Amino acid sequence: MLARKALMTRIARLEGVKARVAPILYMEGACGVRLKADDDVSEIFKNGRASISLGYIGIHETINALFGDKHLYDSEQLRAKAIAIVERLRQAVDQWKDETGYGFSLYSTPSENLCDRFCRLDTAEFGVVPGVTDKGYYTNSFHLDVEKKVNPYDKIDFEAPYPPLASGGFICCLLYTSPSPR
């Protein structure tokens, strides 16, 4: 899988790095260990000591691309498909963790810049695709698209199945359009 290969490339960059490159971190205990100057730092990141996260954006747009542009919020079937995609991502990172000893995790990415940039790149490559690139941005991770106007409680309920899958973290964002929401 391409995502695993990319993350393993990041890990490989630590191989051969000696503790002396950052003595406060690796030799004086800031990382919870005291290595010798010529010790390889990569080993301390195994066994869950640190995480390397797979982030994702655009679950809403992915569902639209695969199943049409009915809104995810309005369809239990589409919601189930979206959750299944994120569950599969979580299973993958858990498997990679078991296979390598590195702390792979799934990060429900809050990345407005990336949501904008990737949509622009995809629009340039594939044109305007209704329900996918037509807004000019992708939705953050599992978030409810901001164009869907619901109250904050319904938004939280809609997003509730996803945080337990986000072993690398997530953000819950509520937008209030009034200084005194009711």
State each model region's role.
Residues 1-66, 70-71, 175:
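Structured mid-domain segments that build the active-site/substrate or prosthetic-cofactor binding neighborhood
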Residues 6-15, 90-101:
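Flexible helix-coil linker/hinge segments at domain or subdomain boundaries
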Residues 13-27, 74-79, 99-110:
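Short, glycine/acidic-rich hinge or "gate" loops at secondary-structure transitions
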Residues 72-93:
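Short secondary-structure subsegments characteristic of cysteine-rich extracellular domains
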Residues 97-137:
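Extended amphipathic alpha-helical segments with heptad-repeat/coiled-coil character used for oligomerization
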Residues 125-161:
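Intrinsic disorder at enzyme termini
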Residues 176-181:
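Conserved small/polar residues in nucleotide/adenosyl-binding loops
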